[in-house]
C-alpha cells in the first residue's frame, strides 16, 4: 500500500503542476504579451461604427445582400462562425459543379452587364472556412457597374475606393493582393452619405 502511494504521489503532483502551468500560467502570459504587443489583433480585429458599437471583424466575412454593396465570397455556411467549414468537394464531384452553377446564376441576375467569363473564381466558389473576409481586387472591380447604377456614384470613384482599400501580401510575401469586403463597404457607405 505504501509503495502505491509513493508512486501515485509524484504522478498527481506532476499532473497538477502541468495543469496549472499549461492551463493557467502559459495562456495568461501569452494573452498578456499579445495585449501588450498587438492589442487590436488580440481583441479579434474588431471594427466599430461612429457610435463605438462593434459591427464586425476584419477577419470574418459577412453576408451583404443589398445589391448596392460589394458582395464577398460564396459561403455554404452563410457566414456563421460557429459552423466554420465548407463541403470542399473534389473538382470531379457533380455537387461542386451544381454549387458553382447556382452561384453563377445568382451572379448573372445581379450583374447582367458582366459576362460570365469575366467573373473571378473567388466570387463563385467557397473558401475552405466559409468565412473569408477578403476578395480579389478584380472580384471587387467587376461589381462596380452594378453598384454605380444603383448608387449613382461614378465608376471612377468606386474604382479609386477599391484601389484605396486594396492590401498587398502580408510582409510582401504571404498571401495575395486582396480587398476586405467589410472595410470596402464601410468606405462605400461613407460615399453614399
Curated annotation (Swiss-Prot):
What broad class describes the main subcellular location of this protein?
Answer: membrane
Write out the entry's keywords from A to Z. ATP-binding, Cell membrane, Ion transport, Membrane, Nucleotide-binding, Potassium, Potassium transport, Transmembrane, Transmembrane helix, Transport
Q: Which InterPro entries match?
A: KdpC
Which spans are transmembrane here? 14-34
Which subcellular locations apply to this protein?
A: Cell membrane
Coiled-coil segments on the chain, per record: none
Q: Name one GO biological process term.
A: potassium ion transmembrane transport
Q: Which GO terms describe its molecular function?
A: ATP binding; P-type potassium transmembrane transporter activity
Q: How does it sit in the membrane?
A: Single-pass membrane protein
Q: Which GO terms describe its cellular component?
A: plasma membrane
Functional description taken from the UniProt entry: Part of the high-affinity ATP-driven potassium transport (or Kdp) system, which catalyzes the hydrolysis of ATP coupled with the electrogenic transport of potassium into the cytoplasm. This subunit acts as a catalytic chaperone that increases the ATP-binding affinity of the ATP-hydrolyzing subunit KdpB by the formation of a transient KdpB/KdpC/ATP ternary complex.
Q: Please state which protein family the record places this protein in.
A: Belongs to the KdpC family.
Q: Give the multimer and partner information.
A: The system is composed of three essential subunits: KdpA, KdpB and KdpC.
Protein name, UniProt field = Potassium-transporting ATPase KdpC subunit
Whichever gene encodes this chain, its name is kdpC
Amino acid at each position: 500500500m505504501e509503495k502505491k502511494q509513493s508512486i501515485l504521489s509524484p504522478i498527481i503532483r506532476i499532473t497538477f503542476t502541468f495543469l496549472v502551468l499549461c492551463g493557467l500560467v502559459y495562456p495568461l502570459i501569452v494573452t498578456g504579451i499579445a495585449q501588450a504587443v498587438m492589442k487590436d489583433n488580440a481583441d479579434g480585429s474588431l471594427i466599430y461604427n461612429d457610435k463605438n458599437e462593434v459591427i464586425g471583424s476584419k477577419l470574418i466575412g459577412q453576408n451583404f445582400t443589398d445589391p448596392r454593396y460589394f458582395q464577398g465570397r460564396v459561403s455554404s455556411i452563410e457566414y456563421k462562425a460557429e459552423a466554420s467549414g465548407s463541403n470542399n468537394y473534389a473538382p470531379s464531384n457533380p455537387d461542386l459543379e451544381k454549387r458553382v452553377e447556382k452561384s453563377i446564376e445568382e451572379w448573372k441576375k445581379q450583374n447582367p452587364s458582366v459576362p460570365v467569363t469575366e467573373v473571378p473564381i473567388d466570387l463563385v466558389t467557397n473558401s475552405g472556412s466559409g468565412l473569408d473576409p477578403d476578395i480579389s481586387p478584380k472580384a471587387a472591380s467587376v461589381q462596380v457597374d452594378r453598384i454605380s447604377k444603383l448608387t449613382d456614384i461614378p465608376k471612377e470613384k468606386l474604382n479609386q475606393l477599391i484601389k484605396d482599400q486594396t492590401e498587398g501580401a502580408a510582409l510582401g510575401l504571404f498571401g495575395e493582393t486582396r480587398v476586405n469586403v467589410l472595410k470596402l463597404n464601410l468606405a462605400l457607405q461613407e460615399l453614399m452619405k
